[in-house]
């Protein structure tokens, strides 16, 4: 399996034949069939993808990443994972990519470690409701629009603030997802105890 060293956003855009606009931050969109055979990526930057449809299997080491339609997956610098396309399913996703240098010295840079969905131990995607999906999609579009505008003294701060807002919503939705699962598991345990 080929290993792709993605040390820059420019490299990502070149490998996946996507438009390149900024060396340290980008919004990407893919609606094209996967052209690569199974491959591994060594991430050199942060990446968060909003997937409309699960079109590949993702593996961290020997653990399969649990993801599906209408979900978010996230990767951090230094993480290595394998991707293999699912036949008949074309990728459909948008993503925010940013290099650690872009957030250095910002509130986001100081707080990035609190976003546990970037942790290697996190191998479960965030599964979104339709309204949550729209919120995340809108925030990614705002970041993309800001990147298309003429740069001024406010651009960097606005992009960082919107990425942080995006991540804060992800934390909120993760908390909801795991709270619901905890309640479901507690309910199953309660019914089991009642049967005894």
Task: Label every model-predicted segment.
Residues 1-59, 63-66:
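Generic protein-terminus/edge-of-domain signal
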Residues 127, 150-158, 170-196:
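Short, Lys/Arg-enriched, Trp-marked, Pro/Gly-tolerant hinge/linker segments that flank
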Residues 84-148:
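A hydrophobic/aromatic-rich effector-binding and dimerization subdomain
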Residues 73, 77-83, 103-104:
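Histidine-centered metal-chelating micro-motifs
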Residues 132, 139, 155, 159-162, ...:
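Amphipathic alpha-helix face/heptad-repeat signature
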Residues 57-59, 81-88:
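Short beta-strand His + acidic residue motifs that chelate non-heme Fe in jelly-roll/DSBH
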Residues 52, 69, 77:
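A cytosolic small-molecule/anion-sensing beta-strand core signal
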Residues 47, 135-142, 162, 166-169:
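Amphipathic, well-ordered alpha-helical segments in soluble domains
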